[in-house]
Structures are given as C-alpha cells and as structure tokens.
C-alpha cells in the first residue's frame, strides 16, 4: 500500500488511504522475474532507483521451481538482462539480451510460450507478453472483476488493456452466444497470444 500511496501523492497530488489484502504468504510467490548481470557476469538485481547491480545468491520471494540459486551459480556473460518465468505446467523459460542496447531479449532455454490455466481456461503467454508475477494474482483478480462486473448473458463487454485475455477468458462463457467480448490491446506480442488463445 505504501507504493500506491506514494504514487498518488507524487503524481496525482492526492492523499489516499488503502487497505491491501495479503494473498498467500510473503515468500515463494513470484512466477517470473527480471535480473541483470554485473560486468563480471554475477547475477543480481538493480538497486532501487539506480542502475547499480547488486549480486544476489538467493531470492526467497521467487517460487523454488525457478531455481534462482542454480541460476546465480552460473557464469553469465556481463551486462545481460535475464528474464525467467515458470508456467502452470512447471516449464521454465529463460530469455536473455544485452542491457546496453535496445535488442529485445530472446529465449535461450525452455519454451517460447508458457502455458497457464485460470479457472481451468488455458492461456498461452509469450515471453514478451505481460503476465501477473504473483502466482495467485490471475485467480484473485478474475474473481474480483467477476464479482464487481456482474456479467450477464447477452452483455457486450470491452476488455481494455486486455493483454493475452485473462479477463476475456472468464467473460466469454458468461455472456454466452448472444453476448460479445471485445478485447483491446496495444502490445503486438499480447495481441498475438490473445488471437491464439481465442482461435
């Protein structure tokens, strides 16, 4: 809640008070992360509000299946961005790219497309597409949206900033044959994933 309160104060010049509901425990919840390497190839994370890379040998907020300790023991090339994710099926993807240029990261290990299931609806997510990093977030967010949206058969919905189709996947069955869901997304990668997810 401190981050949100700070952003409202800094950007919107408004004072807000929030109550944040904790979802799951404080450790082992992240399914994806972006790390960087030092010039010498040590894996770590950027210091807050800085470009300084702090080598880290373990990160307890990550799901154990990401095997961060094993990754931190590798000898990496210097000045790399390392993006790692784990799917619902347990497949780990590692994508790398150099931090000193604008070249997009490329998958170096694992599948190019991760598979997730939210309330039994399968979704495919490319490495470049956004996906929630907290393992419970997709479920919790869809439950909250469904509770407040009160979607009925025959409704016409707009899923703005719809990404790969997290909310659309839940809305389709509710609106039924007489309804419609239009997903709007600007990311080429996420749009491609959404087209594949709803083909």
List each language-model region with its residue ranges:
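Accessory RNA-recognition modules of RNA-modification enzymes
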Residues: 1-199
């Amino acid at each position: 809640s401190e981050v949100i309160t700070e952003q409202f104060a800094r950007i919107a010049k408004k004072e807000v008070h929030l109550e944040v509901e904790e979802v799951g425990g404080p450790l082992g919840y992240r399914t994806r992360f972006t790390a960087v390497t030092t010039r010498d190839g040590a894996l770590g994370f950027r210091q807050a509000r800085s470009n300084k890379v702090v080598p880290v040998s373990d990160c307890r907020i990550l799901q154990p299946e990401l095997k961060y300790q094993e990754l931190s023991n590798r000898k990496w090339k210097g000045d790399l961005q390392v993006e790692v994710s784990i799917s619902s099926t347990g497949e780990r993807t590692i994508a790398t790219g150099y931090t000193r240029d604008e070249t997009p990261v490329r998958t170096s290990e694992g599948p190019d497309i991760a598979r997730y299931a939210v309330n039994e609806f399968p979704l495919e997510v490319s490495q470049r597409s956004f996906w929630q990093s907290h393992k419970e977030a997709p479920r919790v967010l869809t439950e909250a949206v469904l509770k407040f949206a009160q979607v009925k058969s025959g409704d016409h919905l707009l899923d703005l900033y719809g990404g790969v189709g997290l909310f659309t996947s839940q809305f389709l069955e509710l609106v039924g044959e007489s309804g419609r869901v239009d997903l709007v997304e600007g990311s080429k990668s996420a749009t491609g994933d959404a087209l594949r997810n709803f083909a």
